[in-house]
Amino acid sequence: MLGVGDTAPEVSAQNQHGETVTPAFERPTVVYFYPKDFTGGCTIEANEFEDALPEFRDADIEVYGVSLDDVETHADFAEEEGLSFDLLADPDGEVAAAFGIDTSEGYTARLTFVLADGEVVATYDPELADPSGHAREVLEETREAYV
């Protein structure tokens, strides 16, 4: 798994609208990996990122959610939950692999990376705790460090 100080990977994936997204990772960017759309903890986490999205945007911090779900599933999930940030579809696990995340179980672990200036600047493992409050923690720490 990538750690603090590692170079940001070059990745591209389709979002829930079928558009190809290639994050630059120059300005502060949050990439959070989650196991699966429409599951309890993942839905909580996505909604918390959505609720905090205006504050992320005010601080010029990008947010991307990534799972092994396909574009259509992401589109359904985003519509049902009212998510307006990009959910990147990674059905072949290429984005996860670029971050050093294991997908052998058919899903990714719940992991979050903050990238800026072309490198990883923070990592979070909310798998160790309830995902509630995770988005707020990431926002506050990233805003404090980079804004």
Q: PLM features: residue spans?
A:
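Chalcogenol-based redox active-site neighborhoods
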Residues: 1-147
